[in-house]
Regions:
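A conserved active-site cap/scaffold subdomain adjacent to cofactor or substrate pockets
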Residues: 1-71
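C-terminal, non-catalytic "cap/extension" segments appended to globular domains
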Residues: 56, 60-195
């Protein structure tokens, strides 16, 4: 929702007030397009909505190989560079901006990255289901977020500590289906880029 056209249009006048020099000649449409620009990047946390999961996939592939014993730690930088080129078309200039950019592995947090991709897919399915009960675009345009937060509280937040994520999603919006996420990305970026 935070990168949606409706949300950008609703908050943009306030954003312009805080940054009058930088955004004085920039329309809400231009700002929306800039916020949603799809372009491969070197750093996961600076990536766009469309390519983010490719960053996650690189990490997942490397974790699988490490845990499966088919990749040694000393070979991670080369594998990272290979996968970044293959998945994102990017050359990795150094290990700091490559395989050392995240703190997860150095703290022993393996298997964590896929949860980011799942969160995006869960979010798309929840948004789809929320739109059946709440006029999301209208609520955002009017700055009335109470119907959205009420839906989230009723269907998701109050159960977050009681059930595992898959059960929270199933209870809120049925069996998990990643097509909601791929459909969301296809619709959004087809419209943005006239595809």
């Amino acid at each position: 929702m935070g990168r949606s056209r409706g949300f950008i249009e609703a908050i943009y006048p306030t954003v312009q007030q805080f940054f009058p020099e930088q955004l004085g000649g920039v329309s809400a449409e231009q700002f929306y397009r800039a916020v949603n620009k799809a372009q491969p990047s070197l750093v996961r946390t600076e990536s766009d909505e469309l390519t983010y999961c490719l960053h996650v996939m690189v990490r997942y592939e490397i974790e699988k190989q490490l845990i499966g014993g088919t990749l040694e730690a000393k070979d991670v930088p080369a594998e990272w560079a290979k996968l970044y080129k293959e998945y994102l078309g990017i050359d990795v200039p150094n290990d700091r901006d490559g395989c050392l950019q995240d703190s997860h592995w150095s703290s022993g947090a393996f298997g964590y990255f896929p949860s980011y991709a799942l969160g995006n897919a869960y979010g798309a399915q929840m948004l789809h289901n929320m739109e059946q009960d709440v006029d999301v675009e209208d609520s955002i345009a009017k700055g009335e977020l109470a119907p959205i937060t009420a839906w989230l509280h009723e269907k998701v937040h109050q159960y977050g500590g009681l059930y595992v994520p898959a059960d929270v999603v199933r209870n809120a919006c049925g069996t998990f289906d990643p097509h909601y996420y791929t459909d969301y990305l296809t619709r959004k970026f087809s419209e943005l880029y006239g595809l």
